């Protein structure tokens, strides 16, 4: 059982790291004066989905970490 949990922990860790790395940085400030604005709802929808996936795998990572630490 512990091997299955460790495998799921590794998978959730890898997906969490990749989902964090593919996030677009929220550039706010003086550097964005001449940059393009995002008016497309498709971009916002993708960003919202990516945020949900990131939070889901963060929760799974913390859950598996806690369970494995108790064992």
Curated annotation (Swiss-Prot):
One of its GO terms (cellular component) is chloroplast thylakoid membrane. It is found in: Plastid, Chloroplast thylakoid membrane. GO terms for molecular function: protein-transporting ATPase activity. Keywords: Chloroplast, Membrane, Plastid, Protein transport, Thylakoid, Translocation, Transmembrane, Transmembrane helix, Transport. The chain crosses the membrane at residues 4-24, 50-70. The keyword Transport applies. It is a multi-pass membrane protein. It comes from the Eukaryota. InterPro entries: SecG. One of its GO terms (biological process) is protein secretion. Belongs to the SecG family. Involved in protein export. Participates in an early event of protein translocation across the chloroplast thylakoid membrane (Potential). This is Probable protein-export membrane protein secG. It comes from Porphyra purpurea.
């Amino acid at each position: 059982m512990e091997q299955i949990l460790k495998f799921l922990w590794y998978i959730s860790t890898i997906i969490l790291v990749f989902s964090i790395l593919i996030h677009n940085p929220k550039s706010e400030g003086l550097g964005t004066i001449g940059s393009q604005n995002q008016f497309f709802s498709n971009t916002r929808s993708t960003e919202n989905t990516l945020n949900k996936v990131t939070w889901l795998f963060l929760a799974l990572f913390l859950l598996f970490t806690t369970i494995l630490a108790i064992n």
